Structure formats: C-alpha cells, structure tokens
Amino acid sequence: MKTWLLALYDVLSRYKNVWNETWKIRKQLDSPVREKDENEFLPAHLELIETPVSNAPRFVSYSIMLFLTLAIIVSIFSNVEIIATASGKFALSGRSKEIKPIENSLVKHIFVKEGEYVKKGELLLKLTALGAEADTLKTKTSLSQAKLEEFRYKSLLEAVEKDQLPILDFSKIDLPFMTENDQKRVTLLIEEQFSTWQKQRHQKTLNLNKKEAEKLSYLARIKKYEGLINTEQVRLDDFRALYKEHAIAKHTVLDEENKYQDAINELEVYKASLMQVENEVLLAKEEQELVTQLFKNDILDKLKQATDNVNLLTFELDKNNQRQQVSEIRAPVSGTVQQLKVHTIDGVVTTAETLMVVVPEEDSLEVTALIQNKDIGFVKEGQEVVIKVEAFPYTRYGYLTGKVKNITLDAIEHPKLGLVFNTIIELDKKTLSTEEKEIPLSAGMEITAEIKTGMRSVISYLLSPLEESIDKSLRER
C-alpha cells in the first residue's frame, strides 16, 4: 500500500517539476511578435500558423450562448396568461320580451310597426280568440235568462209569504238582453203558479171546512143524545117506580130500558165518529199547510238552482271577459319593437307563437357566452375577460373588457360544441372607441370572449409538450 502511494507521489512530483520549469520559460516558447505585413512575407505554412485567428466566430458563439442564457432566465421569470376562449353575443340584462298569444286567435288591429318605440302598457295588438265573441254572447244570454228565473222565483216566494201577487219591477235587475216578451212570460208564469197554489190551497181549505162542519154536526148530535139519555134516565126511573107499584106491565119497563140503552149506544157511536172526524180535521189542516210548504220548498229549490246557475254563468262570463282582455296585447316594458311577424288583418296566429319582440331601453348591455366543457373547471366568477367583437376587427377598433358575472350550474346541449355552460359577462364599457367617434354596440352582435383563468411561466409552457410526451412514453404496459 505504501509503495503504491510513493509511486503516485513520485509521478505527481515529476509532473509538477515539469510544469514549473515550463512556466518559467513560457515567454521564450512563444513565437516572436510580428506585424501583419511581416506575416504575409513568411512561407505559406508559417504564415498560416503565425497569423492569429479572427475574433468574429468567437464573438458569434459567445453571443449565441449569452442569448440562450438570457432566454432561459427570461422564460423562468416571465409569465403568460392562460386563456379560455368562449363564443357568444351581446344581450340585454333584462332579456328581450317575446310577445305570444295564449290561444289561437284572429288579428283585428295592429298598432305598431317594426322598429317603433313603445311605452310600457301601450297597446300593441288586438286579437280575437276563435269563438270568443260567440261564447261571450251565449254566456250573456244564458246569464240574462238565469237572472230572470232567479227574479221570478224570488217574486213568487214573496207572493206566497204575503198571500198576494207582487208588483213586478223589472228595472231592479240589470238584464241587457231582456225583452218585453220575456217580461210578459215571467209575469204570466208567476200568475199561473200563484193561481195554481191558491186553487190547491182552496181545495184543502174546503176539505178542512167540510171536516169542521162534520165535527160540529157530531158535537150537536152528541149533545142531543146526552140530553136524551138524561130524559130517558128519568123516564126509566119513573117506569121502574110504577112497575114496583104494579101500575104498569113489565114489558113497558123493558121497552123503556131498550130506548135508554139505544140512546147510550148512539151516543158512543157519535163520540167515536167525533174522534175520527177530529183526526180528519187535523189531517186536513196538515194537508192545507203541506200544500203551502211543498210549494215554498219547490220554489226555494228552484231559486237555489237559479242562483247557482247565475253564479256559474257569472264566473263563465268573467272568464270570457278575461279572454278578451288578454286578447289586447300590451307592451310589458318600454322599448323598441323588433322581429314583428304580424302584418295581416284577420290573419290567424297560433298558441305560443312569437308575434314580436320588445327590446327594453333601460337594460344594461352584457355578454352571454358558451364555455366549453374542457374549460369550465378553470373559469370562476370575477375573472377578467377580453371581448372581441366579430363585426369590428380588434386590431383597428380595439376590444372591450369585463368580468365573469355568473355561470350556469348545468350544461346545455349545443349541436356543434356538445355540452357547454352558459355564462354572463359584465362589461366595463358599452362602446368601442376610435379616433373618430364612439361606436355603440347593440344586442345580438357576435363576440369572442377570452377569459383569463390564470398565469404560467414561459419555461413551463415550452416544456409542457416534452413533459406530456415523457408522461405518455415512460409507462409500463
């Protein structure tokens, strides 16, 4: 081990001594310094050896290395923006108001023109729902008849309670479709029904009077026989006294007893008949009252039906009136009429068909854009956005700035882009500025929105393809 170290030490010492000696005579080893013209007169091989090399290649190589070093340093410390691109258009924050009918209708009047300014509540169109006028007329006629029936039964009920025909005042009821014939018909019906009730009640009264007379007749007979029985009782007592004195025969006493017993039997018969007649009198009174009660009950039932019918038809008329009111289409907001599709009087419009669009005047302009599914994970509310208008090249007219205001939570199906998310972008400025003038923007213009989702270094951007290739290639199958 020591021999190996000694040998190594000797070798290094030898090289050190050689280097020191060479260093001492280094200037003697250099070629003599000659001028440029002196080198030109040397032999060719010596001229090539003695002439110094040009500094240009060295300068170029140093410059390239310096540039690469600076580029690497800049790429490490410099950042670029990460952009998510979305296509969209300008829209009003309140959204344009679509005007649609609620049912199939005919156009009666058109009060506006394309591009006309309208105020809130101003009449735009007047429509007539198919069959609405006929339904309204039919309902009004039926309601008039129902109210007339209600009036008839109320008057008839009043007549029964007062037991006299009322004075009919048709002016108390509002019946625009009532004719003079209707009044005569109602009056005649009331008189006929009242007369029929009076006749029925009169028949029951006559029957009651008859039963009352029979009752009085039986009472008189009972009173007569009660007196006769008393007389026969006295006569029988006298005959019995005479018989005890043997003044008369026994047959005479027996005949008198038979008369007395017959009188008692007749009295019992009349009393039984009286009880029957009294029951018949009570029944006749009940029948008399029942005629009136049944008649009133029938009137009350008919009156209830008429009242229910009036209420039902009134509701139906209100519904028809609402249909006609809805047929008068008014402006929901103040704004400008656009996309007017109705131009023909008596033309047919269908349910939920867009007849026109009213663009509000006071709503602020904003951007609605569609964010692709691959970018939605990086887009957040409040991020800065650059908006480039398709109609005005941004290299000449510039661009707008804004911020992400809202992002929908659910994706929508787009025929070309697939599943996308709708977002609303709030603008910082509503016009494009040029040296000449301010260019106003309107709803419907197409735009391209560049949403700033973050920052990344340049070196990371340049190396990302390499990283991706390495990640894909260095995998075990």
From Swiss-Prot:
It comes from the Bacteria. It is a single-pass membrane protein. Residues 206-287 form a coiled coil. One of its GO terms (cellular component) is plasma membrane. Keywords: Cell inner membrane, Cell membrane, Coiled coil, Membrane, Transmembrane, Transmembrane helix, Transport. The chain crosses the membrane at residues 64-84. Induction: Levels of toxin expression vary greatly among strains. Highly leukotoxic strains (JP2-type strains) produce more LtxA protein and ltx mRNA than minimally leukotoxic strains (652-type strains). Variations are probably due to different types of promoters. Its main location: membrane. It is found in: Cell inner membrane. The keyword Transport applies. Disruption phenotype: Mutation has no effect on the levels of leukotoxin mRNA, but mutants have significantly less total leukotoxin than the parent strain. GO terms for biological process: protein secretion; transmembrane transport. The keyword Transmembrane helix applies. Probably part of a complex composed of LtxB, LtxD and TdeA, which forms a single transport channel across the two membranes. PANTHER family: MEMBRANE FUSION PROTEIN (MFP) FAMILY PROTEIN (PTHR30386:SF27), MEMBRANE FUSION SUBUNIT OF EMRAB-TOLC MULTIDRUG EFFLUX PUMP (PTHR30386). Involved in the export of the LtxA leukotoxin. NCBIfam families: type_I_hlyD (TIGR01843). Belongs to the membrane fusion protein (MFP) (TC 8.A.1) family. This is Leukotoxin export protein LtxD. It comes from Aggregatibacter actinomycetemcomitans. The lineage of its organism: Bacteria, Pseudomonadati, Pseudomonadota, Gammaproteobacteria, Pasteurellales.
